[in-house]
Amino acid sequence: MHRYRSHHCAALRKCDVGIKARLSGWVHRVRDHGGILFVDLRDHFGITQIVADPASPAFKIIEKVRSEWVIRVDGEVRARSDEVINTSLPTGEIEIFAKEVEILSKSDELPLPVFGEPDYPEDIRLKYRFLDLRRETMHRNIMRRTEIIAAIRRSMQENGFTEFTTPLLTASSPEGARDFLVPSRIHQGKFYALPQAPQQYKQLLMMSGFDRYFQIAPCFRDEDPRADRLPGEFYQLDVEMSFVEQEDVLVTMEPIMRSLFEEFADGKPVTQSFPRLSYEEAMRKYGSDKPDLRNPIIMEDVSQHFYDSGFKVFAQILANDENARVWAIPAKTGGSRAFCDRMNGWAQSEGQPGLGYIFWREEQGKFEGAGPIAKNIGEQRTEALRMQLGLENGDACFFVAGDPKKFLPFAGAARTRVGEELDLVDRDCFSLAWIVDFPFFEWNEEEKKLDFAHNPFSMPQGGKDALECQDPLTLKAFQYDLVCNGYEIASGGIRNHSPEMMLKVFNLAGLSKEVVEDRFGGLYRAFHYGAPPHGGMAAGVDRIIMLLQGVKNLREVALFPMNQQALDLLMSAPSDVSPVQLRDLGIRIAPAAKND
């Protein structure tokens, strides 16, 4: 018999009754029922119940064991009586009568429990992640992560993509987030950077004659953490294709993403044909470029009802600014003063002056609007609003006014809040959509210059003619995002493969030819030697797994993540290094400035 086990802890069944078995694992819990000891023995695969009575030669040893000790058990497989069968366990019809027990390893007092999975402070969980990962939910999340990544690889290979591994030490690129810098010992004073994404390398692969590339790529960005973004590093499904237009990429990747969600959705419906929304449409209807389409609320422009109206606040806003609009956020079933006042209070807590509203009641077969706005604009305008928005008895509507460019973030947040408060959001589905036609540039008011709105390497719609003839702020890019349930899960574009257009694009953003050659020299040179039209995308693996597992925090689906302060509490990183190491690198740490 094997030194440690003949079976794992989820293997034995009723058909194995009578055989001798050897199991090894962790003591999940110990119970004493009238002098008979029961041990739930756990390993990677599952749990088996071990039994020892005072007549068992193993009894005295089992009396000593505690939670999370590692033991080996030899014994006989016995059937449980009908009244004690545990239908929640695959091994619930049997138990092992222990005849010999060996203690392989003891455990100190646990800083957090493994059995029962109560809520525990996250920093404790991360410091003792090896214990946290023993818990059933975390173990299941990590195993599901592995299964999802394996399914991605299988699907990509079935669709003709080849996996390539790109370098992890590369040049710093100041665009986007901050780089993690790695000092060079050999070339002192110079630095490598960990890649924020394999963007240039995957394009260079297309220049090198390869056709369809993918990689489960580690990416590194020195940015502030949040629940849907891991500090430090994350993984993305990186994709690039040669000789393609935007339609080719979308048509290729949509069934791959749909089948991935269907495989791991646990029966929840998945969008079969992903709708396509322009960036402008998404912002106008939902106040977000990553709308949650499970929320049925669609915002509408209702400005015409407020021009020269009795509600002077909105009327004056419209009269004083030609860009001003009034948008409505319909709230089905939200027609109570208590709810409307609660939303108004929430808006004030968000730094807004308030959130105007109307709610409707049916009196003697006639709809009447209630609230200050209805009172001021009058019955006719109130009824016209209701008809435009398709609202009925017991419904409400909230309003935001001003320049949409300024109020959009709040309007989108208000739409989300209303949908959640009124339980309008369908939690049991995955709603996916493409967002297309992103603006190429945006205006940086602080620095009085153009910034790239999305990806600087994308192709402008209209090509060279558009670059030369159009107002840069009206340019659209061949860029697209894939969104799901309010999260951006993928982003991509058709690349600019012309060196002349590349220089023109960067010049509009204030970067000279010399700067482009310095920062993107490898890619720029490659464009001069026969660059194929190409495009691709990158999907956030961690975020997709988070959605499929139904958790709100990426750290619940990552093995050894940092905490919110970008600290690895398990490995004590970042850490001090020795003076010798610094000297070898030619680095001196400047003392931190004191705050007077």
UniProtKB/Swiss-Prot annotation:
Residues given in the record as ATP binding sites: R221, D222, E223, E488, G540, V541, D542, R543
Annotated spans, Aspartate: 199-202
CDD domains for the chain: AspRS_core (cd00777), EcAspRS_like_N (cd04317)
A Gene Ontology molecular function term of the record: ATP binding
Pfam families given in the database record: GAD, tRNA-synt_2, tRNA_anti-codon
GO cellular component: cytoplasm
Catalytic activity entry: tRNA(Asx) + L-aspartate + ATP = L-aspartyl-tRNA(Asx) + AMP + diphosphate
Enzyme Commission identifier(s): 6.1.1.23
Matching SUPFAM superfamilies: Class II aaRS and biotin synthetases, GAD domain-like, Nucleic acid-binding proteins
Compartments where found: Cytoplasm
Superkingdom of this protein's organism: Bacteria
Binding residues for L-aspartate: E175, R221, H454, R495
Record's keyword annotation contains ATP-binding: yes
Keywords tagged on the record: Aminoacyl-tRNA synthetase, ATP-binding, Cytoplasm, Ligase, Nucleotide-binding, Protein biosynthesis
InterPro entries the UniProt entry points to: Aa-tRNA-synt_II, aa-tRNA-synth_II, aa-tRNA-synth_II/BPL/LPL, Asp-tRNA-ligase_1, Asp-tRNA-ligase_1_N, Asp/Asn-tRNA-synth_IIb, AspRS_core, GAD-like_sf
Function: Aspartyl-tRNA synthetase with relaxed tRNA specificity since it is able to aspartylate not only its cognate tRNA(Asp) but also tRNA(Asn). Reaction proceeds in two steps: L-aspartate is first activated by ATP to form Asp-AMP and then transferred to the acceptor end of tRNA(Asp/Asn).
Oligomer and partners: Homodimer.
PANTHER family: ASPARTATE--TRNA LIGASE, MITOCHONDRIAL, ASPARTYL/LYSYL-TRNA SYNTHETASE
Family assignment from sequence similarity: Belongs to the class-II aminoacyl-tRNA synthetase family. Type 1 subfamily.
Protein name as catalogued: Aspartate--tRNA(Asp/Asn) ligase
Species this protein is from: Bartonella henselae (strain ATCC 49882 / DSM 28221 / CCUG 30454 / Houston 1)
Organism phylogeny: Bacteria, Pseudomonadati, Pseudomonadota, Alphaproteobacteria, Hyphomicrobiales
